[in-house]
Amino acid sequence: MTSPARRHRERKLAALQGAANPQFDQMRANAYELQLMQLAEHRRTLKGIQSIERKIDAKRTMLPVYTPWIDGLLAADRGGQDDVLVTVMLWTLDTGDLEGAFNMADYVIRHGLSTPDRYERTAATLIAEEVADTGIKLQEAGAGPSYGLLCAYLELLAHCDIFDQVRAKLHKAVGRAALAEGFKEEAAQHYRRALELHDKVGIKKELEVLERELKKEQQPDATGGGS
């Protein structure tokens, strides 16, 4: 566990990245190397764990170590490639904390950060897929993320180049969240968009049921007696 003094120092150094003072540049570079060393150690630990569930549990215990560094980067908002931030964002998504990962995802997309070499896909694609898969998994367990949060991710990634199948899954998750909160028209729109992007996204029957409900609700009450 890091000491309060070290956490404070890491937060200040990260926030000062890109400052004109060469001394701060060197201090920040040294601190970044320490973060990378810590990350490499944690990755070695994770590599020795076979269970996906246990890996996720391990990531939850590791993530707080990086909080001061990440807080400093987000506060400075200066951009620049940072493999620590990108990895921590992906680990946070892995743990299912979509809300906790959003500010990091926003930073990564706005500043055009790349994924480390060990990842074969772009940051935008990885974010979209993690959010969609996690959202759908939580929805099927009856504890899905909020419609507003998923819409925020969808908007963040709107102009990014992402595989159609991945974006389709994200629209599927957003549609289900909309439906869960009573926004049927919006849900239908997202379902239709998901099918436009990938017709095997697995939402056809849900859309058919929803469209029947909407049609029924839009019809005048047949039992009504007029005025």
Feature roles, as predicted:
Residues 1-82, 106-161, 216, 220-227:
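N-terminal alpha-helical interaction modules that lie
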